[in-house]
Amino acid sequence: MPRTARLVASLPILAALLVQAACGGDASSGGQASGTTTTTVGVAPETTTSTTSTTTTTAPAEPTTTTVAPAAVYDFTAISPIVQAFIASKGLNGAGLIVVQRDDGVVHHEHWGEFGPERISLIASSSKMVVAGILMRLHDDGLLDVDAPVADVAAWGAGNPEITPAHLISNSSGLVGLFPNPAYGPYVCQFLPIGTLQGCAEKVFTTPDDDADIIPPDTEFRYGGAQWQVAGAVAEVASGKSWADLIDEVYVQPCGLEALAFNNPFTQLEGEPYRYPASFNSDPSTLMATDNPNLEGGAYVTTGDYGALLLMHLQEGMCGDTRVLSVESLERMHSDRIMEAYGADVGGSGYGMGWWVDQENGRITDGGLYGTVPWLDLEDGYGAYLVVEADSPTGNALAGLLYDVVEEAVAGRTG
């Protein structure tokens, strides 16, 4: 069968997979969990001060003294038994967790089973906050006005003259989202690793075949879908750079990331529907090179990579001495835009730009189809990234067991 035909034939499986994730079905249990190995890293700052006395004719100068503040100490020992029991009960191949704190950096980094610091995992929708950040960076640089029509940037934007980039990255464009039909015909290019991002976005934005299904922007929350392809294409036009180059320039180089990149994996990898494609096995070379990465769900990372991005969000947009995002852009990403713009909510959750906003506890998250759960507690100044290679219900179930444990460990910091 020709490769293109095989890719298209995979779309019904993709549709079933995405619907299952939305419904929160339980993951099936497999065999026994592999042997557990853990790596734990604690990082805390040192404060150095110098005091020098005055030299007199009757006494020698006192030596310079250095006072080192006690290192911050966190107790995360409650986490491992919970995770070990969970992966054994679900038959998982392991898990990874990194916790970062605004002042202390990486305060916990642990892996179980087959996972380790170098393991690269597909993260599905946990890609969205990464994408939103690229557009906000271009906004910071004056290359893109996220509140102006797409048509101001891209010639093909005239197809939907009222839609802005801010609409796209808040799932508020009025274009057809993932549901109820993830394999929506007019937008099928978003899941194919053939063609280009520009070509796909132009097709999505100009096709007349969706006319009966689209609505005005900022009138209804429609999660996911090809609006994210359009967002990436707008970023390419505004910057004059490819998506891969933008990822490298904005995130990889300043933040020292090891693996972050995008592809379009959904129709390339064989595996059981509804679950992580085990055939990827931490190896991006299993994917064909593509000029049409899937932006809403096509990234892959290590735990350390995602932790660095979370820390950047906590440290006012800085990676080391390099500014990645402005404070103003971060505030917009983290705020509940859909409630502010048109009074929408989704079962008690709001949505910013790439982030779900829990309207009850203020926690923001960007969970993925395959079991990744990143979260930030902006008020208390910490964040965490949890990864299992399973499905969304499984990742969310484990995260639910860890939210309070992580919070208590951070709150109990000493030193």
Language-model segments: residues:
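Extracellular mucin-like PTS domains
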Residues: 34-68
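Beta-lactamase-like hydrolase cores
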Residues: 66-102, 201, 205
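Short, gly/Ser/Thr-rich active-site loops of penicillin-recognizing serine hydrolases
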Residues: 393-415
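Sec-dependent bacterial lipoprotein signal peptides
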Residues: 1-21
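A short, well-structured edge-of-sheet supersecondary motif
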Residues: 84-116, 374-377, 383-385
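Short active-site loop at a secondary-structure junction
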Residues: 90-94, 110-168, 213-226, 294-297
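Bacterial lipoprotein signal-peptidase II cleavage site
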Residues: 23-33
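Short, surface-exposed loop or secondary-structure junction motifs
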Residues: 161-366
